[in-house]
Amino acid sequence: PYRRQRQMCIRDSITAARLLDCDADYVAKLEADLKRFPPMQISKEGYLQEWLEDYKEVDVHHRHVSHLYGLHPGNLISPEATPELAEACRMTLNRRGDEGTGWSRAWKINFWARLGDGNRAWKLFKSLLHPAVDAATGGHGSGTFPNLFCSHPPFQIDGNYGGAAGVGEMLLQSHEGFIHLLPALPDSWTAGNFRGMRVRGGASIDLDWKDGRATRAVVTALVPGKFTVKMPASAVRAEVKVGGRTRTYKKPVFSLELNKGEEAAVYFF
């Protein structure tokens, strides 16, 4: 993943310098460096290449999928912005399979959530919670210990943190510059709510859903700014109330201008 980590670090440094209007000479150097990164490539068989050359995979089912870093936690790949690369990631995950150690399963939960497949993410989450200790033999493997520690088989905190992050990704995403509500809701999560989840850009989100459909959300600005919201797939329109004003949106993406501490109540239909 290190190549994509460096690529994103340089890209974000350029963005920060431009926002702050500083370090012009350094930005020019970084821009030249950014062009040196090889592009992400799709193999002849359709999966995302792990290496620069299209080598034949020695272990098709290996638990490591670090070449998908651009999908998660990165934001270089998404179904909307780069559909071909996203599909190549999907094929990679299907080839590698769902099995693996705790951290590997946790990461795959996040990958599938980023691809918008809540059912696959939920399936992996349930496998992450599979008892690690065999009641009959006392032996243990991957899964979760009775104290809810993730098992590699030795204790591995990656699975706990990563699994929790995966649930968050199923319910709310903001890595593409907009607030995406219920981007990967599993079919079995028919009703529920969350409160106070934070998104990039400085907002807090509350949301309720019933019968698999979002009913109401509250966007609270923690800083003044413009917040772009993408409606859940189940919604056809949204009524937004800010202060004493109400506005209706029928397009799937809309923007809200909010002051610090201001709330926008969004009702979905």
Identify the residue ranges that each predicted region occupies.
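Single conserved hydrophobic/aromatic residue that forms the stacking wall/gate
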Residues: P1-R6, I10
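Active-site core of glycosidic bond-cleaving carbohydrate-active enzymes
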Residues: R11-S174, F178, T215
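Non-catalytic C-terminal accessory modules of carbohydrate-active enzymes
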Residues: N119-K250, F254-F269
